[in-house]
Amino acid sequence: MELKNIEQQPQLQNGNGTATENNEKGEQKPTEGGERTNWGNGLEFLMSCISVSVGLGNVWRFPFTAYENGGGAFLIPYIIVLFLIGKPMYYLEMIIGQFTSQGSVKIWSICPSFLGVGYGQAFATVCIISYYSSLLALTLYYLFVSFQSVLPWSYCRDEWTNCVNSRPEDYSSTMLEAARNATSSLLIGNETTSLADNDSVQLQSSSELYFLNVVIKEKLDISDGVGAPDWKLTLALLVSWIVTFLVIMRGVKSSGKAAYFLAIFPYVVLFVLLGRAVTLEGAVDGIIFFLQPQWGELLNPTVWKEAVVQCFFSLAVSCGPIIMFASYNRFDHSIYRDAMIVTTLDTLTSLLGGITIFAILGNLAHNLQVDNIREVVRSGTGLAFISYPDAISKFQAVPQLFSVLFFFMLFVLGIGSIVALQSTIVTIICDQFKSWKYWKVALVTSICGFLLGLVYVTPGGQWILTLVDFYGGTYVVFILAIFELAGIVWIYGLQNFCDDIEFMCNKRVSLYWRVCWSFFTPVMMIIIFIYSMATIEPLKYSDLYFPLAGDIAGWIVFAIGTAQFPLWGIWYISHHRNGNLWQSFVSCLKPNENWGPANPETKQAWLLFKSEKARQRASKTQSSKMGQFWQKVGNFCGSST
């Protein structure tokens, strides 16, 4: 595919221009013109990628997803999906960001009519940011109350019927008391219904009732609205956004330094919790329960779909952070090594988090004298703010300390993720308006993020969170990831893309990457997306269906996100007419003059490199039909021959 309106210049000797000029300590400098700052060093980039990819999804989402989809058997489809979809997408986004030194919208100079993919991903990122900050608020709330002499969720309030104290020393007595209260509540006239014979009566732990009644003040019906924001959670939300702003206000200069702590500290706490968890009674049963494979689930297409969703959620691909982080690299940074480290570490952390969490849940089941651990397992926010606190309150030694460590770890994990997501939006805006100050854009977007987050700290906030995550996050991200891959690999061309990688990394692209990008990754994603849409069911929260208005609102959110792709494509074609409509359409599928390395001298060398590659291929083209056939196969697979 040819480049339009770009004059070819003589090649530089090193092929990388001033991008390779570094000081003796390996510090990375901005490109000429000061248009883009670089990371202080390569380790800051690696730590930043770890902090966003190793996040809340590893600690509470992966364990439950694995448990629900075959236990240990889930690891097989997850690892297969990781190698065929996760790693290829992650590496592709790192490459495209570093090669162009642009954010997730500006990179689409590679295929201008696909500009809407970048804006659609930005919309999905805003949706994720809006509810992610509310999870930070909940985490911060629990962190603050953990400093009390008695953990507030460990005991029942007088007004809570059918409540069981979470404190182990109170369990036996409160269990009997709760049973008596439940039985007495079933008295109807002179008739008494036995508790044992009534399945509708369910005992609840004090940690569950504390979360539902005290923290979020849950509404089970939002037909009359979601209610007003809770002032305590609003304050926690404000603190979360202040911390986020302070981390990102100076761009990679500040976030790069914070990344060391954001990436390393959670591992320290996770290993401390693991050491404590495996020594608890019942921990082994919990770990076995987590890892024990259910082989029959491997034939369930839903398991493979969940593996893909978990992979995307965990690695943060197709949302913009990976492209954004890589865009601040030197042009010749060793990106392959970092991609392999992060994707491998992400998987190992998920396993570590799963073992730790289910060891704690095994102890919880042991203390509650429950044979089936399924009865103490919850998903999503329930797992983080009900099951974990309930288990921690049963620790015999200083439960407050472990509670503080655990929720501070969750807060740090969340900050690492939201810093990356928020920086993505700020970078997109600053790339569009280069005269705008980075810190001012960061401040305004942080204020907007806080205002958007207020809806999630209302009594009906968990309903909205479920809705936005499902329609505005998961499905929008997934479908745009397919278009992202198609635009780069199928429209721009895998051969062109592999040439760009060879120029930047100074080595050929392996067959594994070429086959994944050209065939396995897009085909698997398309099949899984079609299956997901064909089997989609009405959305529920806490086993309750959303009202019709909620479903309509969700589909509107989905439509807004996905409509960015065709709408921006139409806009670009209409503003860049080149002949008739068909000629304009074809022209807008080709890279424009902005595509290529950001450094002018590097770009000159790249253009000559591409011309030489084209000349070599032309000279090797065979005249026979068989030769032409294999030449087409090579082009499709990105072969440089």
From Swiss-Prot:
Membrane disposition:
Multi-pass membrane protein
In Gene Ontology terms, what is a biological process of this protein? amino acid import across plasma membrane
Extract the GO molecular function terms from the UniProt entry. Answer: amino acid:sodium symporter activity; D-amino acid transmembrane transporter activity; L-amino acid transmembrane transporter activity; neutral L-amino acid transmembrane transporter activity
Give any Pfam family that matches.
SNF
Q: Which PROSITE patterns match?
A: NA_NEUROTRAN_SYMP_1 (PS00610), NA_NEUROTRAN_SYMP_2 (PS00754), NA_NEUROTRAN_SYMP_3 (PS50267)
Keyword Transport belongs to the record? yes
Stretches with biased composition (Basic and acidic residues):
22-35
**Compartments (UniProt record):** Membrane
Q: Name one GO cellular component term.
A: plasma membrane
Where is the major localization of this protein? membrane
Q: What parts of the sequence cross the membrane?
A: 39-59, 72-92, 125-145, 229-249, 258-278, 307-327, 341-361, 401-421, 441-461, 474-494, 516-536, 552-572
Region listing for Disordered, in residue ranges = 1-37
Q: Which keywords does the record carry?
A: Amino-acid transport, Glycoprotein, Ion transport, Membrane, Sodium, Sodium transport, Symport, Transmembrane, Transmembrane helix, Transport
Membrane topology (Cytoplasmic): 1-38
Q: Glycosylation positions? A: 181, 190, 198
Polar residues: bias regions: 1-21
Family membership: Belongs to the sodium:neurotransmitter symporter (SNF) (TC 2.A.22) family.
Q: Any idea what job this protein has?
A: Unusual broad substrate spectrum amino acid:sodium cotransporter that promotes absorption of the D isomers of essential amino acids. Neutral amino acids are the preferred substrates, especially methionine and phenylalanine.
- The entry's protein name is Sodium-dependent nutrient amino acid transporter 1
